[in-house]
Amino acid sequence: VRLLTTVTALRCYLQKVARENQDLINSQGLVFGDQTNWFKTAVGLVPTMGNLHPGHLSLIERARRENLTVIVSIFVNPLQFAPHEDYHRYPRTWEQDCQLCEQAGVDAIFAPTPEIMGVVNTSSETQMVQVTPPSAMISGLCGRSRPGHFQGVATIVTKLFNLVQPDRAYFGQKDGQQLAIIKRLVADLNMLVEVIACPIMRDASGLALSSRNQYLTVGEREQAVVLSQGLKQAETLFRAGGVRNSIELIASARQKISIVDDVFLEYIELVEPNTLIPLAKIQEEGMLAIAARLGSTRLIDNTILRDRQPIIAIDGPAGAGKSTVARQVAEQLGLVYLDTGSMYRAMTWLVLKADISIDDECAIAQLANESTIKLTHSLNRDHPVKVWINDYDVTQEIRSLEVTSKVSAISAQSAVRRALVIQQQNWGKHGGLVAEGRDIGTHVFPNAEIKIFLTASVGERARRRQQDFKKQGQPEVSLEQLERDIAERDWKDSHRQ
């Protein structure tokens, strides 16, 4: 793992990574037009304040799976600590952190000093440009007792995004208010980074993992478990009892927590997870959030309550049978079948119809963001979903050999995926659907109740694809050619950004 402590070193490292990526493209013998199919490799950033624990490692492990280059930042941010808070005693475990990063396969650690990050002293908020999130998002929950905290977080996260310029950044759901603010920051400032929310990690007792847990005595750790138990009791009332109003849910959690006298509740609130607006009743989803003090330690925790039918996400390589299985599961369970593969095929058809070159990423990005895809139920068992794009019925056209040969190149383009993911996630807000496609359970519906990864050998997938072509009356294609095409698509899919 490379240890970087200055901006100059970080930029030099990122330039080196970019050159190596270009060399890899060249070594594969790709011409310029093929680079659209391959795409530059992704950089994943995991921002931390050090003192790494299994919760951080879960973020790093996910970043490792989804990116070629993983950078972990370690910076104890003075701007997010008030004068009376624990900045100077916040645990710093540099050697241990480096060892854990090495074991987790991290490529580089960026560990700047406050001076390198422009923080000259703890009162420097008056001396440097700061990022201030919307007041409605920072005035409630933790912001009520920690004025200035989220301005400090937003300022340093913005600086990290500008310095590293990652494709993806990973944050834990435990800091639910921070997560919502960072998502809003990225959206409002048009940052080209995808914020990945990762589940809360807990120990065997249910206590949410936190660097501040080490402040707790053995007895206090046992008492602190009551926070997650209170959330669990409210969650049970929500799921089994059908309770949706905030008064009853909050009262349930409060009643459970009150059995431990030493736990001082700072707040229990029900808010909308993305806007942080207080909720009187859950319509779609709500975040039940808690902050409490136990001795001298401040702890936070939360749970997301979703009022929707389940989402089933089926992932896997091309030709593995995802569509067939998804259709059958949807039919058996009475759920909606969201055919994401057909959406990418429809976009590919539109690109070809518009006579746009597949390596003209800018034109394709504009087309994707101006297009609307609709999926409607069909009585045709071979094509139970009718596909419309910009009011054109393209159900049959998207199965042509020409579309099939180009769809991987189009779906590999990040702008296309972003545009279609927005449409897919809008359909998924109310749940009750079965969705299939690459990365469907990680990027599109990370909170799906059931996730399935379906695979098959290249030979079996080629055989199925040949049978599909015959049913559709398409020209005969040899198994050998189909196997080569599928192997090529697997490679492209595994090397896309």
Give the role of each language-model region.
Residues 1-271, 277, 286:
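Nucleotidyltransferase catalytic core that binds NTPs
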Residues 111, 424-430, 438-443, 447, ...:
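Small-molecule kinase domains that catalyze NTP-dependent phosphoryl transfer to phosphate-bearing small molecules
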Residues 161, 180-183, 189-191, 395-407, ...:
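ATP-dependent NMP and nucleoside kinases share a basic, alpha-helical "lid"
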Residues 319:
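Walker A (P-loop) phosphate-binding loop of P-loop NTPases
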Residues 322:
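Conserved lysine of the Walker
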Residues 333-350:
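Short beta-strand-centered segment that lines the nucleotide-binding/catalytic pocket of NTP-utilizing
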Residues 356-381:
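Conserved nucleotide-sensing/catalytic segment adjacent to the nucleotide-binding pocket
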